[in-house]
């Protein structure tokens, strides 16, 4: 590896999420919130259970379902859509959007520690307002 984090033979830049540098494959990929993944997996599980020839769900599927159930921050489609809409209005990279919604940090300082790319891009007050808005949406979900 050459200094500066790039490999001169391939012309590729080394990925660094803290600088929002991702592999090319990620450029067109969309991010999902843990809550969205949970809803999709739950729907798939229900489809499977109602099918005539019910298939046994894989261990990986069940572990992922359990993980997303445990770490989902939002309980219904309306709240998920509302939070995503709120965050899409901000100048956030899709990675930052997903991280903020999945982690739900309480303070701007915590956000910047968990998501270093936010540092220098958002004032603490602006970031705190975003976090407070997310928390409000979480507290009013049913």
From Swiss-Prot:
GO terms for cellular component: RNA polymerase II, core complex. One of its GO terms (molecular function) is nucleotide binding. Disulfide bonds: none annotated. The keyword Transcription applies. Component of the RNA polymerase II (Pol II) core complex consisting of 12 subunits: a ten-subunit catalytic core composed of POLR2A/RPB1, POLR2B/RPB2, POLR2C/RPB3, POLR2I/RPB9, POLR2J/RPB11, POLR2E/RPABC1, POLR2F/RPABC2, POLR2H/RPABC3, POLR2K/RPABC4 and POLR2L/RPABC5 and a mobile stalk composed of two subunits POLR2D/RPB4 and POLR2G/RPB7, protruding from the core and functioning primarily in transcription initiation. Part of Pol II(G) complex, in which Pol II core associates with an additional subunit POLR2M; unlike conventional Pol II, Pol II(G) functions as a transcriptional repressor. Keywords: DNA-directed RNA polymerase, Nucleus, Transcription. Belongs to the eukaryotic RPB4 RNA polymerase subunit family. It comes from Bos taurus. InterPro entries: HRDC-like_sf (IPR010997), RNA_pol_Rpb4/RPC9_core (IPR006590), Rpb4-like (IPR045222), Rpb4/RPC9 (IPR005574), Rpb4/RPC9_sf (IPR038324). One of its GO terms (biological process) is transcription initiation at RNA polymerase II promoter. It is found in: Nucleus. Core component of RNA polymerase II (Pol II), a DNA-dependent RNA polymerase which synthesizes mRNA precursors and many functional non-coding RNAs using the four ribonucleoside triphosphates as substrates. Pol II is the central component of the basal RNA polymerase II transcription machinery. It is composed of mobile elements that move relative to each other. POLR2D/RPB4 is part of a subcomplex with POLR2G/RPB7 that binds to a pocket formed by POLR2A/RPB1, POLR2B/RPB2 and POLR2F/RPABC2 at the base of the clamp element. This is DNA-directed RNA polymerase II subunit RPB4. The keyword Nucleus applies.
């Amino acid at each position: 590896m050459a200094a500066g984090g790039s490999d001169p033979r391939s012309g590729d830049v080394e990925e660094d999420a803290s600088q929002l540098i991702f592999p090319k494959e990620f450029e067109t990929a969309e991010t999902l919130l843990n809550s969205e993944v949970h809803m999709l997996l739950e729907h798939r599980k229900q489809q499977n259970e109602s099918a005539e020839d019910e298939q046994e769900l894989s261990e990986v599927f069940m572990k992922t379902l359990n993980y997303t159930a445990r770490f989902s921050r939002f309980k219904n489609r309306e709240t998920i859509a509302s939070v995503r809409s709120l965050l899409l209005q901000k100048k956030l990279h899709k990675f930052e959007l997903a991280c903020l919604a999945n982690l739900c940090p309480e303070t701007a300082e915590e956000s910047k520690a968990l998501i270093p790319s936010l540092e220098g891009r958002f004032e603490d007050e602006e970031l705190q307002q975003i976090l407070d808005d997310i928390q409000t949406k979480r507290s009013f979900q049913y």
